[in-house]
């Protein structure tokens, strides 16, 4: 009786972790697709993309 309960718990834990793994994989793939789409959109020749440095000054001012 006890080993059946252990088997049930291990199976439940296994499927729960498998579900979390697939969920994480789905989120990562979705983020990668968004990142690739944003990069492709920013590199189109018709669009002007303003590149701002995170520390507040541009490369031209640094020289």
From Swiss-Prot:
Q: What's one GO-annotated cellular component?
A: plasma membrane
Note the topology in the membrane.
Answer: Single-pass membrane protein
Tagged with keyword Transmembrane: yes
- Tell me, in one coarse class, where this protein mainly resides: membrane
Question: A single Gene Ontology molecular function, please?
Answer: transmembrane transporter binding
Q: Which domain of life is it from?
A: Eukaryota
Q: Which residues cross the membrane?
A: 9-29
Q: Which GO terms describe its biological process?
A: mesendoderm development
Q: Name one Pfam family in it.
A: SMIM43
Compartment(s) where it occurs, according to its Swiss-Prot or TrEMBL record: Cell membrane
Q: Outline the segment boundaries, as ranges, of region: Important for interaction with SLC2A1 and SLC2A3.
A: 7-29, 51-57
- Its biological function? Required for mesendoderm differentiation. Interacts with glucose transporters and promotes glucose uptake. Probably augments the glucose uptake capacity of glucose transporter proteins to meet the energy needs of mesendoderm differentiation.
The protein, known as:
Small integral membrane protein 43
């Amino acid at each position: 009786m006890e080993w059946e309960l252990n088997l049930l718990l291990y199976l439940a834990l296994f499927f729960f972790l498998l579900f979390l793994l697939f969920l994480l994989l789905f989120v990562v793939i979705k983020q990668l697709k968004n990142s690739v789409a944003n990069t492709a959109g920013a590199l189109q020749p018709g669009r002007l993309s303003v590149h701002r440095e995170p520390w507040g000054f541009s490369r031209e001012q640094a020289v």
